[in-house]
Design a protein with these regions (language model features):
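Conserved hydrophobic positions within beta-strands
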Residues: 7-9
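Low-complexity, acidic/Ser/Thr- and charged residue-rich accessory regions of DNA metabolism proteins
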Residues: 140-142, 146-205
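Small-residue helix-packing motif on alpha-helices
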Residues: 89, 101, 124, 177-181, ...
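A general alpha-helix detector
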Residues: 73-77, 88, 109-112, 159-166, ...
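Long, highly charged, low-complexity intrinsically disordered interaction regions
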Residues: 11-111, 127, 137, 144, ...
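Alpha-helical interaction/regulatory segments in DNA maintenance proteins
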Residues: 119-137
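Short coil-to-beta-strand transition motifs
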Residues: 1-5
C-alpha cells in the first residue's frame, strides 16, 4: 500500500499531477483544492489513495493524490456513500474545501451539496446522513479547525506526518492519532518527532 509519494512535480493540470520519485513518474488524479496547493511548487508530497477495480472486463489501478491527510480522509468517507463514486467525490472536493465540506455536512446543508455538479437531493441527503457522525468520530473537523485557527503557530507537517505514521505502525488508528498529534504540535510546534510520539502515547486512547 502506498501512503504518500514525495518527489519532483513533473506535470500538473487541474485534474492530474505527475510526480517523479526515484526515476518513476506517478500519475495521480487530484482535486482542484490540491491543484491550487501544488501550483508553483517543484518538490511536492501527496497522500495517496489506491483504487483497484477487478472482476470486470477491464481491471484498473488508479492513484489519487491529496495535499492533506484530511482531504484524503474525506474522500475515503465520501466514496462509502451509495451513489458517490470516485469522480463524484473528486468533484465535491474540487467544488468545496475540506473545511467547508465538514461544516456543510455538520449543518445538514443540502442546498450547498446540491450546488455541486452531479449531486441531487437524494445523494445530498445520503451524504449528510451517512457521514455526519463519522466525520465527528474521525476528528477530521477538529484537525481542520486547528490547522486554520488564526494565530495558531505553524505546525511542521513533516514532524506531524512522521509522528502519525509511527503511531499507526504501533497499532493506533490514524484518525485519533492525527488528532492527538495535531493537538500536541499546536501547543508545542517545535517538538521533535520522538517527543511528540512519547507525549501522544500518554494521551491517545
Amino acid at each position: 500500500m502506498i501512503e504518500y509519494i514525495r518527489g519532483e512535480l513533473a506535470a500538473l493540470t487541474p485534474a492530474q499531477a505527475v510526480i517523479e520519485a526515484a526515476g518513476v513518474g506517478y500519475a495521480l488524479g487530484i482535486s482542484l483544492n490540491t491543484y491550487t496547493v501544488l501550483q508553483g511548487k517543484r518538490e511536492v508530497k501527496l497522500y495517496v489513495h489506491e483504487a483497484i477495480v477487478t472482476g470486470g472486463r477491464d481491471d484498473s489501478y488508479t492513484l489519487y493524490g491529496f495535499a492533506t491527510v484530511q482531504e484524503r480522509a474525506l474522500y475515503r468517507l465520501l466514496i462509502t456513500v451509495s451513489g458517490v463514486g470516485a469522480n463524484t467525490a473528486r468533484m465535491i472536493l474540487s467544488s468545496i474545501t475540506p473545511k467547508e465540506l465538514c461544516n456543510i455536512i455538520a449543518g445538514g446543508d443540502e442546498r450547498m451539496l446540491k450546488s455541486v455538479k452531479g449531486i441531487g437531493v437524494r445523494t445530498a441527503q445520503r451524504i449528510i446522513v451517512d457521514l455526519k457522525d463519522k466525520i465527528v468520530a474521525s476528528g477530521i473537523a477538529d484537525e481542520l479547525r486547528a490547522v486554520s485557527k488564526p494565530g495558531t503557530p505553524a505546525v511542521d507537517t513533516t514532524v506531524r506526518d512522521e509522528a502519525v505514521s509511527a503511531l499507526t505502525m504501533l497499532g493506533f488508528s490514524p484518525a485519533p492519532s492525527a488528532k492527538v498529534v495535531q493537538s500536541i504540535l499546536t501547543e508545542q510546534p517545535t517538538l521533535p518527532v520522538e517527543q511528540v510520539v512519547k507525549q501522544a502515547l500518554k494521551l491517545i486512547k
